[in-house]
Amino acid sequence: MTTIDLNCDLGESFGAYKMGNDDEILPFVSSINVACGFHAGDPSVMRQTVEKALQHNVAIGAHPGFPDLIGFGRRNMNVSASEVYDYVLYQIGALDAFVKAAGGKMQHVKPHGALYNMAATNPEIADAIAKAIYHSNPNLLLYGLANSEAFIQAAEKYNITLVQEAFADRTYKQDGTLTSRTEENALIKNEDEAIKQVLQMVKEGYVNSVNGEKVEVQAKTICLHGDSEKAVQFAERIYRTFELNGISICAPK
């Protein structure tokens, strides 16, 4: 039976600001990436998100980003590899404390936004992230963009497991990278098209780029975005579609 992980970014609320549909999406995913306070989230939200994830038996991962609350961590920053290492190690440690306090065990780390995209093409950034994971806990998995040589090489260097990731509602360029969110066609807004793309990736191992070329994608986890207007409806549709197609949904080991 084909097996796939469904992951989602949660815990992005902070202070008086509510973001996303965390409670409604949790039943339809197998792993979550929790914001750690730099691009979103705060200590109370981190604790609450961890506790809810454990109640739903969902795997928990840290979602470290750039210290850019105003830009939601989606803006590139001119930072050194050592700064990236510090940012990631700090955020892993913060979330891990809440996970341990709740009696759980953290499973993975997935960089957020601009940090993720920079790491996918910049070996030094990817190396810094992998090193931070290794020094924190070498048993943690690294979620990274499928086919990214930077992620692949960094994971191999530090002997950590890379879980290659694809995106349900994002378009792809010919080189296998995601279309920038600054482009109008970055997101697939039609649910039927997004469902078709996901099934194509999981069952056939490829995706059609924005130019129409087939791009090989051997993903072990699929990312759903939880902050869109119809995020819960979309998550449930993918979940049910996988069930109907005999695809098992579970977190990677």
From Swiss-Prot:
<dbReference type="InterPro" id="IPR005501">
    <property type="entry name" value="LamB/YcsF/PxpA-like"/>
</dbReference>
<comment type="function">
    <text>Catalyzes the cleavage of 5-oxoproline to form L-glutamate coupled to the hydrolysis of ATP to ADP and inorganic phosphate.</text>
</comment>
<comment type="subunit">
    <text>Forms a complex composed of PxpA, PxpB and PxpC.</text>
</comment>
<dbReference type="GO" id="GO:0005524">
    <property type="term" value="F:ATP binding"/>
</dbReference>
<keyword id="KW-0067">ATP-binding</keyword>
<keyword id="KW-0547">Nucleotide-binding</keyword>
<dbReference type="GO" id="GO:0017168">
    <property type="term" value="F:5-oxoprolinase (ATP-hydrolyzing) activity"/>
</dbReference>
<dbReference type="InterPro" id="IPR011330">
    <property type="entry name" value="Glyco_hydro/deAcase_b/a-brl"/>
</dbReference>
<dbReference type="Pfam" id="PF03746">
    <property type="entry name" value="LamB_YcsF"/>
</dbReference>
<comment type="similarity">
    <text>Belongs to the LamB/PxpA family.</text>
</comment>
<protein>
    <recommendedName>
        <fullName>5-oxoprolinase subunit A</fullName>
        <ecNumber>3.5.2.9</ecNumber>
    </recommendedName>
</protein>
<dbReference type="GO" id="GO:0005975">
    <property type="term" value="P:carbohydrate metabolic process"/>
</dbReference>
<keyword id="KW-0378">Hydrolase</keyword>
